[in-house]
Amino acid sequence: MNPSRIRIKMCGMTRSEDIQYAIDLGVDAIGLIFYPKSARNVSLEKARIIVNNIPPFVDIVAVLVNPEQSFVQLIINEIPVQLLQFHGEESSEFCRQFNKPFIKAIHPKTAIQIQSAVDEFFDASAILLDTPSDKERGGTGLTFDWNIIPENLSKPYILAGGLNESNILEAITMCHPYAVDVCSGIEASPGVKDHLKMSRFIKAIWG
């Protein structure tokens, strides 16, 4: 896959100025985390404000971890999200009930676990591969083990887990993902993006 066609999602946004800078850089999607245990959590009230000026063709992705059905529906009703991203132990039945395109994040340790998720979540828009962690649900800064990704997966996958300006080109060249998802690798602190790191990340991919 040509690195110039890699789709890019910047996740864990909490500030309007960071979202605007990401848009100016040409990213494809913005991730908002609706999970109170996350340092990057945003309230519905704040989310309404910071997504206000996002233009067409930049997707808003709501990132959720084992949410209540009613909370997901509230987000759909209140925020103009294009995609839901489930980062917990949600079942395929739970994910599909909202009639909204969704991404299922998994934290696999083996190729078999990846293939099993692709089979189970057959109607997901994509599978997101993130680093296993006993403490955090994404945003750990730990690099995913690229060697366990099976060849010729039948579903598009998004590569996450410890991506930054130093390793992103190697990751793309080795893994050929449909898209990449970066969070801690472009931050000054959790939820606060570093604009220099953001621009360097993009430059590493697109030149």
Swiss-Prot record:
Keywords: Amino-acid biosynthesis, Aromatic amino acid biosynthesis, Isomerase, Tryptophan biosynthesis. Pathway: Amino-acid biosynthesis; L-tryptophan biosynthesis; L-tryptophan from chorismate: step 3/5. Belongs to the TrpF family. HAMAP family: PRAI. It is an enzyme of class 5 (isomerase). It catalyses: N-(5-phospho-beta-D-ribosyl)anthranilate = 1-(2-carboxyphenylamino)-1-deoxy-D-ribulose 5-phosphate. Gene3D superfamilies: Aldolase class I (3.20.20.70). The gene is trpF. This is N-(5'-phosphoribosyl)anthranilate isomerase. GO terms for molecular function: phosphoribosylanthranilate isomerase activity. Its EC number is 5.3.1.24. One of its GO terms (biological process) is L-tryptophan biosynthetic process. NCBIfam families: PRK01222.1-4. The keyword Transcription does not apply. InterPro entries: Aldolase_TIM, PRAI_dom, RibuloseP-bd_barrel, TrpF_fam.
